[in-house]
């Protein structure tokens, strides 16, 4: 059936209140959306950040008269409160969501493919990965930068550390590209489970070891270290991340904005001979070879 969607303009401080009011007025679901296309990059621990200008969207049954709800918000927030009423046609939302995802190529050899799509090149290095939990699927520039970097390496027989493994996409890609062993580390137990499930789906579960930080091995001397997290943890955990690689090992870091790159280059330059920075949109990848 079709739906009525009511959008109310709010701020980060009032968004939760507006959400509760929409639910109280009979909304079947509520969604928050950035009203000004301003990204939220790096929340502090325990924060659930919202944009300074946030649209709160309530989804109502088609027979709902939106006028009383609009009048209610005008009474609370004033006559000039921003709002919009839309009629949404009924769709197969699952199918529409699935249609959004297509096989993606990274570098020369590597493809990331949803399970419901045909593999474009059966002779390529194909990683089967379905969007699911909020972990990497290759669509974000930082993941793409790391996948392209891995595709350009000779990983045959190598040991790879994937720090902040998320979905396991980088470690699984490394194994498919010839690595012998991957050690994946993440602070989130759901990420560990997602990595395990995806490794099984790709037939590499016996080559990947997955750890929470407290359980990670301390004597790793990897050939390749990749960390696609955020600038804050990359800064704070620099000695630990750098310590996972042996002399001459290769490292790639992402989850970094261009403005954050110079500081991290200086920090990691203590241990690595740094390569030129690779940039995709406003994100970048730092890479280098370990000294010694």
Swiss-Prot record:
Question: What InterPro entries does the record point to?
Answer: Ribosomal_L11_MeTrfase_PrmA, Ribosomal_PrmA_MeTrfase, SAM-dependent_MTases_sf
Q: Which GO terms describe its biological process?
A: methylation
Protein location: Cytoplasm
Q: Which residues bind S-adenosyl-L-methionine?
A: 143, 164, 186, 228
Q: Would you identify the family this protein belongs to, as annotated?
A: Belongs to the methyltransferase superfamily. PrmA family.
Q: What does the record give as the function of this protein?
A: Methylates ribosomal protein L11.
The name this protein carries in UniProt is Ribosomal protein L11 methyltransferase
């Amino acid at each position: 059936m079709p739906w009525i969607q009511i959008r109310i303009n709010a701020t980060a401080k009032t968004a939760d209140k507006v959400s509760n009011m929409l639910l109280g007025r009979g909304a079947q679901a509520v969604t928050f959306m950035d009203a000004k296309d301003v990204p939220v990059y790096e929340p502090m621990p325990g924060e659930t950040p919202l944009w300074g200008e946030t649209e709160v969207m309530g989804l109502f049954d088609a027979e709902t008269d939106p006028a009383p709800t609009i009048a209610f918000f005008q009474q609370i927030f004033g006559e000039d409160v921003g709002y919009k009423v839309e009629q949404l046609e009924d769709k197969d939302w699952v199918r529409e969501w699935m249609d959004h995802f297509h096989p993606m190529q990274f570098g020369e050899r590597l493809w990331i493919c949803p399970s419901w799509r045909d593999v474009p090149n059966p002779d390529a290095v194909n990683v089967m990965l379905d969007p699911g939990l909020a972990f990497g699927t290759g669509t974000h520039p930082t993941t793409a930068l790391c996948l392209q970097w891995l595709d350009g390496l000779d990983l045959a027989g190598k040991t790879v550390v994937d720090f902040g493994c998320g979905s396991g996409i980088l470690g699984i890609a490394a194994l498919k590209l010839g690595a012998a062993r991957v050690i994946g580390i993440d602070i989130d137990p759901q990420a560990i489970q997602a990595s395990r499930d995806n490794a099984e789906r790709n037939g590499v579960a016996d080559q990947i070891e997955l750890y929470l930080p407290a359980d990670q091995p301390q004597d790793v001397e990897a050939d390749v270290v990749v960390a696609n997290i955020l600038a804050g943890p990359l800064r704070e955990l620099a000695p630990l991340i750098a310590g996972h690689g042996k002399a001459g090992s290769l490292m790639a870091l992402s989850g970094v904005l261009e403005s954050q790159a110079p500081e991290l280059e200086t920090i990691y330059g203590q241990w690595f001979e740094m390569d030129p920075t690779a940039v995709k949109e406003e994100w970048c990848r730092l890479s280098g070879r370990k000294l010694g």
